[in-house]
């Protein structure tokens, strides 16, 4: 599949979607995007910058949600033009899709909205590539009808993203079989290595996370075989305004990505034949 200006798929090298969870300031986004561009350029990795203008599903009603649509799009546009990288952001049911699509290169649907038929169709009808996150409550094989809805709009540039499955209260687990199952949708599969270690609502008024397991799950997913990796990152996760406990430190991204690219090359060298 053609994504932005590069090809993605199991016959192509791993690509990266990364950035801070939420837009905190113009300077932070430019700094992070610039550093990620340096890292990915050095390693030869195709890169899409990600950040959100509105986090609509925060645990607490008083938590920081972002700068909002107008200011958020200004920041994303600046990243795109000044840093020279494609940008992705997530949208919601109330989002003016065409307005966002005029700025960003890739749209993303939140996991909690994966079953909202009209929403999925509206996003995909905007004509941009779409990364559809699998709900924490959804079986991987149930992504096939979601993809069918998406492609009914005529948009063939659809990706599916695994971000963990609910496992009791305040916990997620990553079933690596889902990565293989979701290939049957015919779409590139992306693994979200940072939200997969989230502990939803685990700190009472906010979500916790176990960032030490980000490289563990990322390595496992790459070994199974994925098209892309999604990872939220921050220069100082302890001070991040959203999802800090599961964000990967920016100063450790190069080391992690270097390892993952080596694993990706070995995995894809041997193919993905099904064994009965």
UniProtKB/Swiss-Prot annotation:
Localization: Cytoplasm
Pathway: Carbohydrate biosynthesis; 3-deoxy-D-manno-octulosonate biosynthesis; 3-deoxy-D-manno-octulosonate from D-ribulose 5-phosphate: step 2/3; Bacterial outer membrane biogenesis; lipopolysaccharide biosynthesis
Keyword annotations: Cytoplasm, Lipopolysaccharide biosynthesis, Transferase
Reactions catalysed according to its record: D-arabinose 5-phosphate + phosphoenolpyruvate + H2O = 3-deoxy-alpha-D-manno-2-octulosonate-8-phosphate + phosphate
Cellular component terms per the entry's GO annotation: cytoplasm
GO biological process: keto-3-deoxy-D-manno-octulosonic acid biosynthetic process
UniProt-recorded Gene Ontology molecular function terms: 3-deoxy-8-phosphooctulonate synthase activity
Domain of life: Bacteria
EC number(s) on file: 2.5.1.55
Family stated for the protein in its record: Belongs to the KdsA family.
HAMAP family referenced in this protein's UniProt entry, alphabetically: KDO8P_synth
Database matches in NCBIfam families: KDO8P_synth (TIGR01362), PRK05198.1 (NF003543)
Protein name per its UniProtKB record: 2-dehydro-3-deoxyphosphooctonate aldolase
Annotated gene: kdsA
